[in-house]
Amino acid sequence: MANSLRSEVIKLYKNLLYLGREYPKGADYFRRRLKAAFLKNKDETDPEKIKQLIARGEFVIKELEALYFLRKYRAMKKRYYSDDKP
């Protein structure tokens, strides 16, 4: 069981690292924060706590995806609609 949790954590880290490439404050900022967050919990051994942390990481993934989607939507809206009000 611990081995499957380990692989889930590694998969989560890689996924977050990939998503962090487009982070508004920069990829280096995101990478440092991500590494610090994972190192803070590296000694956790309780499987239930690890599952909670994985769930939190998946929530962060969803938030990042929403952030990127909204950023792209706003850029597209600026291109096609003027802010001039009659």
UniProtKB/Swiss-Prot annotation:
Source organism superkingdom: Eukaryota
Classification via Pfam families: Complex1_LYR
GO CC terms, sorted: mitochondrion
Disulfide bonding pattern of the chain: none
Any one of the GO BP annotations: negative regulation of oxidative phosphorylation
CDD domains attached to this UniProt entry: Complex1_LYR_ETFRF1_LYRM5
Compartment annotation: Mitochondrion
UniProt keyword list: Mitochondrion
Keyword Metal-binding: no
Cross-referenced InterPro entries: Complex1_LYR_dom, Complex1_LYR_ETFRF1_LYRM5, ETFRF1
Major subcellular location class: mitochondrion
Family: Belongs to the complex I LYR family.
Function field: Acts as a regulator of the electron transfer flavoprotein by promoting the removal of flavin from the ETF holoenzyme (composed of ETFA and ETFB).
PANTHER family: ELECTRON TRANSFER FLAVOPROTEIN REGULATORY FACTOR 1 (PTHR21024:SF0), GROWTH HORMONE-INDUCIBLE SOLUBLE PROTEIN-RELATED (PTHR21024)
Protein name per the record: Electron transfer flavoprotein regulatory factor 1
Lineage: Eukaryota, Metazoa, Chordata, Craniata, Vertebrata
Gene: etfrf1
